Amino acid sequence: MVTDDPSSGNCTQGGFPIYAVNVSSVSHIQLAINFARNANLRLVIKNTGHCYLGKSSGAGALSIWTHNLKNLEYFPGLEIPGYSGPAMKVGAGVTVREVYAEADRDDISALGGICEVSDCH
């Protein structure tokens, strides 16, 4: 039972990861995944917010923080099988607000979800 008496119980880690890696490259992600595999740790991914479903946290896990993966690239005339036209390549740490700003600069439309307090899925 939760109380306001600090001597009434133990302080625990709770449902949070015990390790975290703030990645800024693909090689950092590869190293983190290998560490989690070798240490038999649950792996969770955290981008720019949190998930109400708990996907961005987990007791005893290794959390990979992708917030610094900010690559954002615009392709005005992408040509691939089945599609021809403008496109964007968006890194895992780019916020929807940043995507919208880039789309506005490039005079294109971008569709995404946004929630001012957390990642909304």
Go through each PLM region and give its residues.
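N-terminal accessory segments
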Residues: 1-121
